[in-house]
Amino acid sequence: MDKKPTIAILKNEIDKLKSSFDTEKDEKDTKINHILSVVEGLSKSLSLYIEDNDKETTNEEVNIDEIDKNIVKNLEDKVNCLEQDVQYLKNELKKKDADWQQKLDLIVHQFTKQYDSLKSSLLISQKETSVFQSVQNNSNLPNNSNLPIETPILQIKFAALTEYAQKPKRGSEFSAGIDLRSAYEYLVPANGNKLIKTDWKIQYPDGYFGKICSRSGLSLNHNLEVGAGIVDADYREGVSVVLNNLSPRDFHVAPGDRIAQLVCTPYITPEIVFCKPSDIPDTVRGKNGFGSTGIN
């Protein structure tokens, strides 16, 4: 690859995205307008970065020869994915079939994930129109290049529904789960279960859901396991925990006791397609089900 990779190349690819939209858009179609706004924000950020780092260059090319070419290739691939998403979006909107709104939701979701990934890779500020902040003499960057550093921060929002909600917390800095606490006093009967309220309303980052898991200490020492542990991203009531007591003894839960852990987990929503059994190819395993692969 003789041609030096440049930020300008990426900007040109982003500009293609902008031109792929029809000039006239339905003002009520907020989702399409949102996609266009983030694309324009990305393009503007790239322009500002180019101007800030190479004001004397007339062709808007910024030499990033010091950057690993594999990194730039990865960025270009992501831009191409975005371009394909936009083209697919346009084609689907032209059809306006019965499922077009559902397809639009899926496309917007996938587009947003692709855009966030690209934005993170380009180290763009979380505000679409902000300017890159150059960082010099950083030993973590190749050849101390003036690449900006921006670490995207995911947030999970907790809103207390009552004064009895006990603050959740992580057990350690790198714990995957956030410990959930009981808001009230309960007695979980032997060989039975109880619905434990936390009195917290939760909002997850886009593309994530909450997975409620058992705590190892309760599982090992008291035979307490969590049941029905999926909290969907669009669920907006107070989060409760189904606590199953598999032991022959009742278990007392006091207000503030840690009864489960919440893991913020990414997910995808593939489109459901109905077909004939013959449309699904056979595999080596075939119909062999429970226990067919053995235990060793």
UniProtKB/Swiss-Prot annotation:
Top class in the EC scheme: hydrolase
Q: Which reaction does it catalyse?
A: dUTP + H2O = dUMP + diphosphate + H(+)
Q: Has the keyword Hydrolase been applied to this entry?
A: yes
This protein's pathway reads: Pyrimidine metabolism; dUMP biosynthesis; dUMP from dCTP (dUTP route): step 2/2
InterPro entries xrefs: dUTPase, dUTPase-like, dUTPase-like_sf, dUTPase_trimeric
Write out the entry's keywords from A to Z: Coiled coil, Hydrolase, Nucleotide metabolism
- Report the protein name in the record: Probable deoxyuridine 5'-triphosphate nucleotidohydrolase
The source organism is: Invertebrate iridescent virus 6 (IIV-6)
